[in-house]
Curated annotation (Swiss-Prot):
Gene3D superfamilies given in the database record: Deoxyhypusine synthase
Recorded GO MF terms: deoxyhypusine synthase activity; homospermidine synthase (spermidine-specific) activity
Subunit structure: Homotetramer.
SUPFAM superfamilies membership: DHS-like NAD/FAD-binding domain (SSF52467)
Gene that specifies this protein: HSS1
Keyword Transferase found: yes
Organism: Senecio vulgaris
Keyword annotations of the record: NAD, Transferase
Origin organism lineage: Eukaryota, Viridiplantae, Streptophyta, Embryophyta, Tracheophyta
UniProt EC number: 2.5.1.45
Protein name per UniProt: Homospermidine synthase
CC terms in the record's Gene Ontology section: cytoplasm
Residues that span the membrane, as ranges: none
Its biological purpose: Catalyzes the transfer of an aminobutyl unit from spermidine onto putrescine. The resulting polyamine homospermidine is a precursor in the biosynthesis of pyrrolizidine alkaloids.
Catalytic reaction equation(s): putrescine + spermidine = sym-homospermidine + propane-1,3-diamine
Length: 370
């Protein structure tokens, strides 16, 4: 009996204290920032990768984004038939970066972060929804305010106030928007009829960016820096409302916006990116996420990918899909580097930019003596 009990205890001990396979040298050790060392925001952000959970995913996103920014064609093996001139130019060939975001992020203060990126030409292609276009212009005309998620809808409606999460947009803002945009539509229609101008969503957005002429607008900077902005859902929002009311005032063949030409232009951004690598940063899900990923499928996948959203994959939505699902479609390269950060982009994206784009901009300014 004693022998049997000893065997049982030994077995239990063996189960409880099962010998581990060594992780030394194969995995990063977990440890957070030590505030005894003082307050150093850059070191704090760098410590995210070893903190664990979504902090580590955010840290990985920072690393991958910096890899996008640092990649040069000269890092890759030189092909045998490469001319001397081509060899010299390889250092100047950078990664093409696609940035996608949903409209609520322009309603929020992330707009200013995106404006910074477009102002300094840090991204190459933008994709958003209609709200991501109109809210940028509306903010040049009137303010959005901080409210509460719990404000009663019926009460707000009676006061002419619209709620976006815990943001409040007075309905008067849209009246100002109509007063601003309708005369531009009138002129666009004249140019369509007299000059055979073919308007596409991206061409219309560039025109509006020119007309707003306001440095707080990311679309102004996109126009100024010739950064294409694609929005295949251009009618799904206040701009669609304005197009509808404009058509009522202009019966017959009114203003035409051709989305097919933009599909061609968007796909060509990816198809003809080579020899560049492509990187994608997508805030939120829905149309911007799929549109960017689908274009990159044309080149057998993006080389770098960062997703930041709170959507889950369990309903089969594209919004919630992890990067590995995109790999199965050829939207992210099977050899690419990708991460999803499960976090509100209003928290994660400014932190990411602080430790990637902004750091590199600051270093470049110091080198150039600015």
């Amino acid at each position: 009996m004693a022998e049997s009990n000893k065997e049982a205890i030994d077995s239990a001990r063996s189960n409880v204290f099962k010998e581990s396979e060594s992780l030394e040298g194969t995995c990063a050790k977990i440890g957070g920032y030590d505030f005894n060392n003082g307050i150093d925001h850059s070191k704090l952000l760098k410590s995210m990768v070893s903190t664990g959970f979504q902090a580590s995913n955010l840290g990985d996103a920072m690393i991958i984004t910096n890899q996008m920014l640092e990649w040069r064609l000269s890092h890759d093996e030189v092909p045998e038939n490469c001319s001397e001139e081509e060899k010299k130019n390889r250092e100047s060939v950078k990664c093409k970066i696609f940035l996608g975001f949903t409209s609520n992020l322009i309603s929020s203060g992330v707009r200013e972060t995106i404006c910074y990126l477009t102002q300094h030409r840090m991204v190459d292609v933008l994709v958003t929804t209609t709200g991501g276009i109109e809210e940028d212009f509306i903010k040049c005309l009137a303010s959005t305010y901080k409210g509460k998620f719990s404000l009663p809808g019926a009460d707000l409606r009676s006061k002419g106030l619209n709620r976006i999460g815990n943001l409040i947009v007075p309905n008067d803002n849209y009246i100002k928007f109509e007063d601003w945009i309708i005369p531009i539509f009138d002129q666009m229609l004249i140019e369509q009829k007299t000059q055979n101008v073919l308007w596409t969503p991206s061409r219309m957005i560039a025109r509006l960016g020119k007309e707003i002429n306001n440095e707080t607008s990311y679309l102004y900077w996109a126009y100024k820096n010739n950064i294409p902005v694609f929005c295949p859902s251009i009618t799904d929002g206040s701009i669609g409302d304005m197009l509808y009311f404009h058509s009522v005032s202009n019966p017959g063949p009114g203003l035409v916006v051709d989305i097919v030409q933009d599909v061609i232009a968007m796909d060509n951004e990816a198809v003809h990116a080579s020899p560049q690598k492509t990187g994608i940063i997508i805030l939120g899900g829905g149309l911007p996420k799929h549109h960017i990923c689908n274009a990159n499928m044309m080149r057998n996948g993006a080389d770098f990918a960062v997703f930041i959203n709170t959507a889950q994959e369990y309903d089969g939505s594209d919004s919630g899909a992890r990067p590995d699902e995109a790999v199965s479609w050829g939207k992210i390269s099977s050899t690419g580097k990708a991460v999803k950060v499960h976090c509100d982009a209003t928290i994660a994206f400014p932190l990411l930019v602080a430790e990637t784009f902004a750091v590199k901009k600051e270093k470049a300014s110091k080198v150039n003596g600015f």
